[in-house]
């Protein structure tokens, strides 16, 4: 069935001038999701994308946890994190991603922010020793851009997240656990065995003017 669906998708893709793949071909963050055995014709890797940028930061937190994703797993994840993080003697931050409110709550050494804008989240991530988050691809690209050590907790039932978490765990980049098994002592200990994300590897240089020349040529025509 998967092969049939792939053939149908590739036939539809073939009608376009190019197929852009959001990954770095040499680094291959997404594993077989961006590098299957067979690629569509006229495919082009355009590198990874992130809203964040590297900045100088002072370490403020031992751990920053980021909640995201659909309900009901979002709330389950949030409650589990609060339960374990509020018991820690270390300074920690929990970002809930709830855009409908801007509230701050403190429980012992845990600060809970209902919402952080992109700039504040960028700063928070870089001021922490370790990140806990879901393993969605956009999150992974952000963590890679900022060269962070992370523990990935895939949303149960989301096969893409489960694959990416396992793939990066096998590559010894990120430790990964199920949300029911979150244990801070174990997380801190196990995360030391993983390298974290690094931008030090040679990346494919993307010429954006060449990519967007497709649209310029179409406009001229």
Language model features by range: what are they?
Residues 8, 119-120, 139, 183-186, ...:
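Short acidic active-site motifs
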Residues 18-20, 44-46, 93, 111-113, ...:
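Hydrophobic/aromatic beta-strand patches that form the interior of the parallel beta-sheet core
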Residues 35, 47-130, 140:
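Donor-nucleotide binding loops and adjacent catalytic segments primarily
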Residues 120-163:
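A donor-sugar binding/catalytic signature common to diverse glycosyltransferases
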Residues 185-221:
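C-terminal amphipathic helix plus adjacent low-complexity
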């Amino acid at each position: 069935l998967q092969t049939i669906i792939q053939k149908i998708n590739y036939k539809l893709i073939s009608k376009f001038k190019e197929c852009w793949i959001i990954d770095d071909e040499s680094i291959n963050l997404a594993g077989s999701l961006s590098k299957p055995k067979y690629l569509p014709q006229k495919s082009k890797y355009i590198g990874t994308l992130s809203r964040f940028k590297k900045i100088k930061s002072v370490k403020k937190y031992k751990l920053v946890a980021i909640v995201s994703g659909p309900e009901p797993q979002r709330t389950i994840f949030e409650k589990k994190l609060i339960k374990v993080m509020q018991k820690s003697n270390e300074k920690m931050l929990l970002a809930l991603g709830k855009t409908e409110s801007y509230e701050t709550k403190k429980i012992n050494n845990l600060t809970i922010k209902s919402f952080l804008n992109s700039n504040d989240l960028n700063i928070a991530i870089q001021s922490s020793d370790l990140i806990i988050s879901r393993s969605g691809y956009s999150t992974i690209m952000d963590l890679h851009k900022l060269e962070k050590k992370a523990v990935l907790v895939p949303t149960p039932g989301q096969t893409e997240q489960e694959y990416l978490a396992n793939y990066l765990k096998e590559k010894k980049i990120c430790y990964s656990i199920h949300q029911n098994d979150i244990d801070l002592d174990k997380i801190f200990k196990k995360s030391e065995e993983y390298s974290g994300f690094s931008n030090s590897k040679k990346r494919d240089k993307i010429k954006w003017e060449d990519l967007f020349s497709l649209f310029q040529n179409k406009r001229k025509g």
